């Protein structure tokens, strides 16, 4: 599967062995990254992602936990993330459909190949086809509400 172009992945946080990309418009604050490697993903620090503070493989493993696809990685020594097979769709009481697999998405910016995404289930998103929390449902498993999401690291 071809990896998305770097300019479609979000802001880059480079370290010698791995680059982490963060797309704040897709983050729904599930906090898998913060729980997985708090020394790397620290929303109280600037920059909030420091990929150099852990082993590159450990960073990649935690990034793959991100259910929304807001985080991506590129290892210096390997190809891009491989998709899950078969494709898995999970419903989430907090709003989005969580999808993992070899995804071909039609977006407002054109076609996109993806491995993980939180897709809008309510139809109110301004970031089609991705969930942006427009439904006002709890923003993430960590207990963040929509109001908390607005003051999260993505906006700072």
Specify the residue positions occupied by each region the protein language model found.
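Short, solvent-exposed interaction modules
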Residues: 86-118
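Boundary-flanking segments of nucleic-acid-binding domains in nuclear regulatory proteins
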Residues: 115-117, 129, 143-147
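Short, intrinsically disordered, charge-biased short linear motifs at domain edges
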Residues: 12-24, 50-55, 105-111, 115-121
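Ordered, small/hydrophobic-rich secondary-structure cores
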Residues: 2-40
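Extracellular/lumenal glycan-associated surfaces
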Residues: 69-70, 101-102, 127-135
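Cysteine-centered iron-sulfur cluster-binding motifs in ferredoxin-type domains/subunits
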Residues: 21-37, 53-69, 120-129
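Non-heme iron-sulfur electron-transfer modules
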Residues: 1-10, 39-64, 72-94, 137-156
């Amino acid at each position: 599967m071809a990896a998305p172009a770097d300019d479609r992945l979000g802001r880059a946080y480079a370290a010698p062995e791995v680059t982490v990309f963060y797309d704040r418009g897709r983050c729904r604050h599930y906090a898998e990254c913060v729980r997985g490697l708090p020394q790397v993903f620290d929303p109280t620090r600037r920059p909030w992602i420091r990929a150099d503070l852990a082993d590159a493989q450990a960073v990649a493993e935690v990034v793959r936990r991100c259910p929304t696809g807001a985080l991506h990685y590129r290892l210096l020594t390997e190809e891009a993330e491989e998709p899950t097979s078969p494709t898995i769709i999970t419903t989430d009481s907090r709003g989005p459909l969580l999808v993992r697999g070899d995804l071909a998405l039609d977006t407002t910016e054109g076609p996109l190949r993806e491995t993980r995404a939180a897709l809008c289930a309510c139809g109110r998103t301004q970031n089609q086809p991705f969930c942006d929390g427009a439904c006002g449902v709890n923003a993430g498993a960590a207990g963040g509400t929509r109001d908390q999401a607005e003051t999260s690291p993505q906006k700072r």
